[in-house]
Amino acid sequence: MNSSIMLASGSKIRAELLQNAGIDFTVMLPRVDEVSIKAALLADEATPRDVADALAEIKARKVSDKNPGALVIGCDQVLEHRGTLLSKAATEEEAEQQLRALRNDRHSLLSAVVVCQDGQPIWRHVGVVRLQMRDFSDAYLEGYLERTWPSISESVGSYKLEEEGVRLFSRIEGDYFSVLGLPMLELLGWLTLRGDVQG
């Protein structure tokens, strides 16, 4: 089919993943009030999976409406811990609070990807990863925050697994690409089946 591919995301890591896989694409940032949308979804008792999926679809639709014929990839990732969704930390103090809450406990990352064409969703997937943080010391936590802030403010949970954040964990169950925010294997498989990516 060879439709043009667009990424509706400002995430550097998502763009790098597609680029490293040899995918030809362009980036267009969607203008979406994620905080308000997430709050409305949670008020309607949406599940974490539904929140991630809905936000990914809204982002993809927004860009798709302006780019007829293009395959627009929208993504979102949420972190669920003991029934609560954690957002990106706004301050270093908030990052410390999040990491103290996650320390020596399990949480889940849900990474949604929705592809829209001509304003309509045509494919979707949600990757789920379960992670166990180790019982790291307060001294390590302080040093970690000094070394990684403000970079970790870009990520839910206040860590980047592709960087020093990997040292916070004792166990990870699931797909590495989903941890990074884009379930690549499923997306590439679908694009290949469609003929938009050579297989």
Residue ranges and their predicted role:
Residues 71-77:
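Alpha-helical membrane segments and adjacent membrane-interface helices in multi-pass membrane proteins
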Residues 18, 56, 76, 95, ...:
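Residue-level signal for inorganic ion chemistry
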Residues 124-198:
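Active-site oxyanion/phosphate-handling segment shared across diverse enzymes
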Residues 1-71, 139, 146, 185-186, ...:
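N-terminal polybasic phosphate/anion-binding patch
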Residues 77-107, 133:
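Active-site-adjacent loop/tail segments of enzyme domains
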Residues 98, 112-116, 120-124, 128-129:
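Anionic-ligand binding region
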Residues 24-35, 114-120, 154-166:
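Mobile beta-alpha loop/short-helix "lid" or hinge segments that flank ligand
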Residues 80, 114-116, 134, 171:
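Short beta-strand-to-turn element immediately C-terminal to the catalytic PLP-Schiff-base lysine
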